[in-house]
Design a protein with these regions (language model features):
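Conserved small/polar residues in nucleotide/adenosyl-binding loops
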Residues: 115-117
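Short inter-helical turns and helix N-cap capping residues of alpha-solenoid HEAT/ARM repeat scaffolds
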Residues: 29-32, 51, 82
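Short conserved catalytic/interaction loops centered on acidic-Pro-aromatic/His motifs
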Residues: 49-58, 104
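Alpha-helical solenoid scaffolds in eukaryotic proteins
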Residues: 16-23, 64-73
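Hydrophobic residues within the alpha-helices of tandem HEAT/HEAT-like
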Residues: 24-25, 41-48, 92-97
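Extended alpha-helical interaction segments
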Residues: 1-35, 102, 107, 112
Length: 117
């Protein structure tokens, strides 16, 4: 994920990464819930660790993220696999709606990345 976050600072890579993430949200069927969940995880990570443009692009797609707060998928065993997507989408939507929290999370992520270098 760190490599992808770093790639968002490159204009060409950014323009490949972001549309791919948002395509995962709208083009996948409910039974592909794992790909949707992983795309949400990645988006949250790059919002905190990627370029500032990621934040702007994610905020521009906030309505799509908010729709995922109502995601439902019950698998063959009767387990609600949508619960984690709903929770992650709710957290991400809240994060993107609050500039101060975004700044604080990005600062925290930057500090952690310096420790791991």
């Amino acid at each position: 994920m760190q490599e992808i976050a770093q790639a968002t600072f490159n204009y060409h890579d950014f323009n490949e990464i972001m549309p791919t993430i948002f395509r995962r949200f709208v083009e996948k069927e409910a039974h592909d819930w794992r790909q949707i969940y992983k795309a949400l995880q990645l988006l949250e990570y790059i919002v905190k660790n990627g370029s500032e443009r990621v934040v702007d692009e994610a905020r521009a797609h906030l309505s799509t993220i908010k729709i995922l707060r109502n995601f439902h998928y019950i698998d063959e065993q009767g387990k609600d696999q949508g619960v984690n997507i709903r929770a992650r989408a709710k957290e991400l939507a809240a994060l993107l709606s609050d500039f101060d929290t975004i700044r604080a999370e990005r600062r925290k992520a930057r500090a952690l990345s310096l420790i791991h270098i």
